[in-house]
């Protein structure tokens, strides 16, 4: 059966050997028997495009125990990187388990893939397994977008996901490193991290992160805390001063200048100015007698 992701990203038959996990042991042996190579573990390097940055040691130990009992049913897949040096394309967890078991060689299929194909397969394989953290998943989406020059919408269509899912994951990459590290280490959940995004101030984001971890705030408590902070930092609206039209200013200045001229003539003129919402009021008192 063709792998949907591989087909959509243009690998076609080239990656058919990577899809053997859904086939029977007998089918696997028939399909890849002549293509399996025993490669020294010392000559194999991890995938440089591996999106997974955290490997669960306990899960690797469990896998090693399974391999010790049943053998390595599915060979790893590699490509030749340099002379006598191979880079893992798929199967790094199996490789790590075999290393823990002290194996000197590991069964492998050698594929001829370029850097873009190698990176894409590593990313797609891990996305299929759905064991990545939210940050690792976001990094995988971003790399696929860059490798294949895709929009978020196009990537969502190829992966069979909603565009909002892709967009929400990618927003996590804009968070400070400490928050992304907490996501990787599972100190906070993805929903905690997403709640921090509206706080544009990094100092505030890190302050709330510390509160989440120390006080073990749940998501609702975190959202309430952030809503309060946003209310506190919201700039207070200044009362708008009503604009005075140019014609009004000319009129006022003309009256003032006239009053000054009258005063210079010797008359003791008193005037008062008052400003109302809709008008200015000028009261002028001219004595009948000097």
UniProtKB/Swiss-Prot annotation:
Primary subcellular site in the record, as a coarse category: cytoplasm
Positions of the DNA-binding region: 153-172
Family matches, as InterPro entries: Chromosome_partition/occlusion, HTH_ParB/Spo0J, Nucleoid_occlusion_protein, ParB/RepB/Spo0J, ParB/Sulfiredoxin_dom, ParB/Sulfiredoxin_sf
SMART domains attached to this UniProt entry: ParB
Biological process terms in GO annotation: chromosome segregation; division septum assembly; positive regulation of sporulation resulting in formation of a cellular spore
Intracellular or extracellular location(s): Cytoplasm, Nucleoid
Bilayer-spanning residue ranges: none
Keywords tagged on the record: Cell cycle, Cell division, Cytoplasm, DNA-binding, Septation
GO CC terms: chromosome; cytoplasm; nucleoid
GO molecular function, one term: DNA binding
Domain of life where this protein originates: Bacteria
UniProt-listed CDD domains: SPO0J_N
Family membership: Belongs to the ParB family.
Cross-referenced PANTHER family: CHROMOSOME-PARTITIONING PROTEIN PARB-RELATED, NUCLEOID OCCLUSION PROTEIN
Biological role stated in the UniProt entry: Effects nucleoid occlusion by binding relatively nonspecifically to DNA and preventing the assembly of the division machinery in the vicinity of the nucleoid, especially under conditions that disturb the cell cycle. It helps to coordinate cell division and chromosome segregation by preventing the formation of the Z ring through the nucleoid, which would cause chromosome breakage.
Name assigned to this protein: Nucleoid occlusion protein
Organism of this sequence: Bacillus cytotoxicus (strain DSM 22905 / CIP 110041 / 391-98 / NVH 391-98)
Gene that encodes the chain: noc
